[in-house]
Amino acid sequence: MNTTAASVCLLAAIAAGAAPIASAAPEVEVLHFWTSGGEARSVAELKKALNAKGVAWKDFAVAGGSGENASTALKARVISGSPPAAAQVKGPAIQEWGKEGVLANIDAVAVAEKWDTLLPPAVAGIMKYKGSYVAAPVNVHRVNWLWVNPAVLKKAGAKAPTTMDEFFVAADKIKAAGMIAVAHGGMPWQDTTVFESVALGVGGADFYKKALVQLDQAALTGPLMLKTFDTLGRIKTYIDRDSAGRDWNLATAMVINGKAGMQFMGDWAKGEFNAAGKNPGTDYLCLPAPGTAKAYTFNIDSMLMFKKPKAEDQKSQLLLASAIMSPQFQEVFNLNKGSIPVRAGVSKAKFDSCALQSMDDLDSTSKAGTLVPSLSANMAVGTAAQGAIMDVIARFMNSKMSSQDAVTALAKAAKTK
């Protein structure tokens, strides 16, 4: 969208706080997959922020933690010529949609509010297509977390693990005490969440980048990838037989209620602990996945804006983008979601120890070059290759496929275009 006189007037309203409109409020339809308890609380805050700017929220929620169902729904709407105003889309998929010529330019608000100075350069780059902003970033999630119930550890006589060897010692003790060692949901994206943390722990950030971002064939077929699958194969023996099709938040609930000891999951899991009234350090532990303390797999949620013919809809999109980037919204949304603010200038006072650790580690890994995009969270590679890779990992998790066969299949899947 070009910066017109109407846009200038709109930005003046944004700068002034955009008081609620007395007449029938304009509406913005938002497609998203934030449907769990903690996520729903976060969405409610975005609705409030948007309503405060005089825009009504039209909810288009599609359940499914990986976003696959939402992606299918979005494609159908775009093909029909009636896309939503905004959709929860992230990573390389933003560029893929840009190539289709269906995205709205939101530079009018991004330039006025100086997003380039508020966002880390790596994040700003992801939000742009051909140099212009087309998406508003909501948060930063760390994916390589291990969530632990300390009461389960105590009952089993186990210690919180920091290495993979320590993890297996703890898992054995939890299993011997009659509890489930690893809470997990048997879905491809959850399988891949475990896989990528194992790969990062086994090979480090350089190996991770070569294998799972650059899709380098030597890295994909080498000994570190074989060790990754060997380790993953051992982990799956600690998962209960009823895991198939289990939603991630139900697996988190198993850790919350003491049915299971540990879960590999991004820090959106913390939103579930918070919703259950649990406190970090006492009721649960947030630990970097074994062997990954000096690395950080990131997942950035973002709202991608689609071209709308009506000027009113275009104005509503800019107001939505402005609301998302406001420090007030960034604070309250991320407190509910379990993530951390993506922009500078947000108070840290209300964030807990897990979030503060995530903030510190984001900064240190960014400086050290060990900050890497999450494969499972759609941040690392294009959708075609990602889907093929995740299928291989899921087959390995749900069959007697050997590690070597998995390595061979993974290398082939990585060539998918």
Q: What is each residue range found by the language model?
A:
Residues 26, 48, 52-53, 156, ...:
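Extracytoplasmic/periplasmic substrate-recognition and gating elements
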Residues 92-143, 168, 194-196:
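Hinge/lid segment of periplasmic solute-binding proteins
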Residues 21-100, 112-115, 160, 244, ...:
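Conserved N-terminal structural module of periplasmic/extracytoplasmic solute-binding proteins
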Residues 171-173, 214-244:
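Glycine-centered hinge/linker elements that transmit conformational signals in sensory
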Residues 214, 303, 345-346, 359-414:
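C-terminal capping/gating helix-and-loop segments adjacent to ligand/active sites or protein-protein/ligand interfaces
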Residues 76-77, 83-85, 115-151, 180-181, ...:
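A structural signal for short loop-to-beta-strand junctions that line the ligand-binding cleft
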Residues 130-138, 168-217, 260:
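Extracytoplasmic/periplasmic solute-binding protein
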Residues 107-121, 125, 186, 202-227, ...:
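Short, solvent-exposed loop/beta-turn-alpha elements that line the ligand-binding surface or hinge
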